[in-house]
C-alpha cells in the first residue's frame, strides 16, 4: 500500500468575479430535461483563437518521458521502460518514432535487485548535434561511478562520439562532494558541464577547456530561442533572465520578470516563453513582460499534463510539445480557432479526483468548459464568510466542505437525485448503498460525495476471535494478558487520538441525524469512553502492538503489518453494531463533497461534469486508495485492482489480492456513516476531559453529553 503516490499540487491564482444573486429554492425535486448536447448552443457559436490538444503515444516499449528537446523537424526524448532508458526521435510530420543507438549495459545496466545503475541528467541539442550526459553510479569494481558524454547527429541518428569525463567537479559551499547536474551544448563541439557553482567548458571528447564560476547566473533556466540562449540571472537579490553568448560566454543585463525562471524551453520558431501561474506565457526578453498563452488546465488532456511542467518545446510551425514528470505520453498543443464555450464555474479545493473530471470534461465537451477556482484565492476564510461569497457571486458548483453544514439544503443547492435517476450512465444502484443513503438528507441529495473513507480497528490476526466474540470483555482480557512491555497501540496513538476516534464513530453509532435524536445514554458508549480513559498508552516506538486504529484506509495495510509484525484483521470497534466500522465523509482528512447551486443557469451541464467524478474511467490516472474510496462500486473495484502491488524488497508494503479481498469485504459490510462534526466533537471532548481528570463521574459525563448533544442534533434536523 506504500506504492508511490502521484502527487500533484495546484496553484491556481484566479480571482473571484462578482455576479448577480440567483433565486433561492429553485430546482428542488424537478427532473432535469435534456435537449441535445446539454442546454447550450444553437449550432452557430462564435469561433475564437485558442488551442487544441493531441496526445502523442510513445514508441513501443516506452512507458514514460524523462527529458525532451527539439531540433528542426525532429522531437528528441529520453524515455523509460523495460530494462533500459531509450533515446527516441520522432519526425514531426509523420509522428513516426525511431531509436538512437544506446545500451544501458554499457553504463552498468541494472543490479541484481533490478535497480538501474545509471541515469541520464543532461539531454540537449545545438547546431544539429545532440549531447547526452550519462551518470554511472557505481563501477563493477566497487568504486565510485563516472560521467560519460555522448554525441549524436540529429539528422541521421548516428553516434558521433562518447567519452568519459576525466575530471571532477570542484568542491564548494553548495556541496562538499559536488556532482555534474547539467549539460548545456554551446555548439556542435563545445558544451558547458555544470555543477551547482561552476560551468566547465568541454570539447567533444569531454576534455576541460575552461572553468566559469556561476556568479550572477545559473542554468536552472535554459531558454533557447533559435540561435539565442538565455539563462537564469541573479543581481542584488533580484531574479530574472540573462542572455548568454555561446562564443564569448558574456552575460547580458538582468531582465526581471514575474515568470518562473527555471525549466527547459526551446523554440524553433524563435519565440520566447516560460511557465507562470500554472500555464505558459509569452515573454518579451527585453522588458520581462509576459502575456498568457494558455493555462495547463485549459489544454491538458489528463492529470499528467495539468501541472507546473517546466519543460516545453515549440516547433517551427508553432506547435507546443509538453510533458510532465515521467509522463506516459507527450501532449501536442496547437494554435487553432475553437468554439467559444460557456463557462461552468467551480469553486473548489485541490482535489485530484475532481480535477481529473474537469480535464476530461474540458477535453470532450463541445459546448461547456469548467473553470476551476480555488475558494478564497489563498485567503483564510471562515465557513460563514465563504457562504456569503457564494451567495454574492453565485458560481455553478461549490465544494461543500467549505460551507456550514446547515446551509447545504434546498435553499441553496439543487436536489441531485432526479439527475441521477434520469442519467443513462449511472443509477442509484451503482452507489455503495450506505454511502448514498447517508447523502440523502432533508428529503434530497444536495451534497454529492465523490470519495469516502473508513474508520475501523485492526488487530493482530492470531488474536481475532471473530466479530461475534470481539467484545469489550474479550478486548480487556486480551490487554490484561499481553506480554509485559508490549504496547496496546503504537506510540503516536495516544488518549487524545483515541478520544477523537470515539467522537467520530459516535456520530454514526449514537446519532440519528435525520430524526434529530441521539442515544449516548444507551448501549455501550459509557464503556467505550471508560476504555479510552483506562487503556495504557506508550511513548516508546516499540512493536509488535495489539491493535491499530484506522482513520483512513489507504495506509491501513502497511501500518498494521508493520506495527503487528505479522498479519491483520479488520476487527472494528467492540460493542458496536454491524461490523464495527464506519464510512466517513472525510477522505484523507478532508471532505470530498460538491453541490450544484439552485441559482446556476447551467445545472444540466454542471451535472454532466460532476458525474464524471463518479465513473470508473475517472480512476485511470493519478488516484489510488490513499485519496479515499470511490462512492460507486465500479469505481471502487477499479481502484482495488489498481492498488494490487507486490514489493519484493519490503513485503510488508505490498497490497496483495488477499488484502484487496479483505478490504472489499470490509467496505461492502460497513453499514453506517460517521460524519466529521466539530460541534459534536467539542461536546464529547470537553465533557470527557473533566471525566478523565477525575472531576466528574462517568455517569454524570454521559448524562451531560446526552443532554448537550440532544439539543444540538435536534437543531440540525
Per-region residue spans from a language model:
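C-terminal capping/gating helix-and-loop segments adjacent to ligand/active sites or protein-protein/ligand interfaces
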Residues: 588, 645-714
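A bilobed periplasmic-binding-protein/Venus flytrap-type ligand-binding module shared by bacterial periplasmic
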Residues: 457-462, 584-602, 621-625, 631-632
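Extracytoplasmic/periplasmic substrate-binding proteins
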Residues: 527-608
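Extracytoplasmic "Venus flytrap"/periplasmic binding protein-like
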Residues: 369-431, 440, 562-563
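Hinge/lid segment of periplasmic solute-binding proteins
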Residues: 403-456, 569-583
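Repeated scaffold domains used in trafficking and secretory/extracellular systems
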Residues: 62-69, 112-125, 169-186, 216-226, ...
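Short, well-ordered beta-strand elements
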Residues: 339-351, 368-374, 397, 609
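Helix-loop-helix "hinge/cap" segment bordering the ligand-binding cleft or interdomain interface
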Residues: 91, 128, 153, 157, ...
